[in-house]
Amino acid sequence: MKLQGFVLLISGPSGAGKSTLLKKLFDEFEDELYFSISSTTRKPREGEKNGIHYHFISHEEFQKGIDSDHFLEWARVHENFYGTSLKHTQNALDNGKIVVFDIDVQGFKIARKKMADKIVSVFITTKNKDELKKRLIKRNTDTIIQLEKRLQNASDEMKELSEYDYLIINDELKQSYEALRAILIAHKFRTKGQNLGQIQNIWNEGE
């Protein structure tokens, strides 16, 4: 009997360590997870491949997707648009997959309106703003202006913590991963979001 999947939605500031934690999660639960590949209007960065890291599309194509309700969620981030396909997400859920989103607060709020009963939301951040700044400087991928903008965006997103189901302060990687892992395992077996009537019928037919 295959249970319905759910959406594990991750948000948090750039530099908080989301990608590192998600990589560890996929290493352990690869067969159960489906990573939602976003569509974006921004240009590919070095090493990024279309259809693997993102679906790179034009502004015109993205606008058509908005108009036709193609996206489960979409948002404008740093002058570019990002969005997640509703159809691909639903197909993965129907196949019992845990669909992983790594999206910002804007996208989370839109996705929640369309699929609230399927979403488990986790906000991942650093212990404080200074620690986040240190990590971003160490990463050395942003200009000073971009760095300040990321820090301001992080401050704005921190105001939305109460909207999320869980909060992980990513100060120690092992502890943070165990917390994320525990959230995933607990929600694999919850009754919320399942077709309980169908499950009961299948169970009775097996008598």
UniProtKB/Swiss-Prot annotation:
Which parts of the sequence bind ATP? 12-19
Which catalytic reaction applies to this protein?
A: GMP + ATP = GDP + ADP
User: Which segments of the protein form a coiled coil according to its record?
Assistant: none
InterPro entries under this entry?
GK/Ca_channel_bsu, Guanylate_kin-like_dom, Guanylate_kinase, Guanylate_kinase_CS, P-loop_NTPase
GO CC annotations on file:
cytosol
Q: Where in the cell is it found?
A: Cytoplasm
Alphabetized UniProt keyword annotations: ATP-binding, Cytoplasm, Kinase, Nucleotide-binding, Transferase
EC number(s) reported in the record: 2.7.4.8
Q: Does the keyword Cytoplasm apply?
A: yes
**In this UniProt entry, which cysteines form S-S bonds?**
none
Q: Which domain of life is it from?
A: Bacteria
Query: Molecular function terms in GO for this entry?
Result: ATP binding; guanylate kinase activity
Cited SMART domains: GuKc
Q: Where is the Guanylate kinase-like domain?
A: 5-185
Q: Which CDD domains match?
A: GMPK
One family from Pfam that matches here is Guanylate_kin
Task: Name the principal localization, coarsely classed.
Answer: cytoplasm
Which SUPFAM superfamilies does the annotation name? P-loop containing nucleoside triphosphate hydrolases
To which protein family does this belong?
A: Belongs to the guanylate kinase family.
Question: What role does it play?
Answer: Essential for recycling GMP and indirectly, cGMP.
Q: What is this protein called?
A: Guanylate kinase
Phylogenetic placement of the source organism: Bacteria, Pseudomonadati, Campylobacterota, Epsilonproteobacteria, Campylobacterales
Protein's gene: gmk
